A protein has these predicted regions:
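Active-site acidic/histidine proton-transfer and metal-coordination neighborhood
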Residues: 1-48, 58
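Histidine-acidic metal/acid-base catalytic patches
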Residues: 39, 43-53, 57-137
Length: 137
């Protein structure tokens, strides 16, 4: 008997809490919005993290966490990234090239063993620019 799910990989994507929602509800009702959540969940189940970098940026800002430190840590825990940028207040799915910190982070990392998804809600030209940028890394 094979272990359930051994023929494929199941991922859990990190969630997002905006500052507006955090202030409105005065708590964080979501699972897996922070590095701490990842560490706690990892103690209970073995799972593959789908790291949505833009979700982490918004959640880090909303919860007063260190985005760069947590991004470095979680980057090493995953082989799958969702990429877009935002203003750290809302998950707006902007071009990754609009965020110089994200661009520098991506340039500094070895992405060869990562699966990347562009999650950009802008016009096709922006998506193509992001795609070409990633393809050259």
């Amino acid at each position: 008997n094979e272990e359930a799910g051994s023929q494929f990989k199941i991922y859990i994507e990190n969630n997002v809490i905006s500052k507006k929602n955090y202030e409105k509800y005065q708590n964080n009702p979501f699972t897996l919005t922070t590095r701490d959540d990842y560490e706690n969940l990892s103690k209970n189940i073995k799972f593959n993290l789908l790291l949505d970098v833009a979700h982490l940026k918004v959640s880090s800002n909303s919860l007063g966490k260190n985005f760069k430190t947590d991004l470095d840590f979680l980057f090493e825990k995953t082989d799958y990234l969702h990429l877009s940028s935002n203003d750290s207040f809302e998950d707006s799915n902007n071009s990754i090239l609009a965020d110089t910190d994200l661009v520098e982070f991506l340039k500094s990392k070895d992405l060869k063993k990562k699966t990347l998804t562009l999650e950009v809600y802008e016009d096709l030209d922006k998506v193509i620019e992001d795609y070409n940028f990633l393809n050259k890394l």
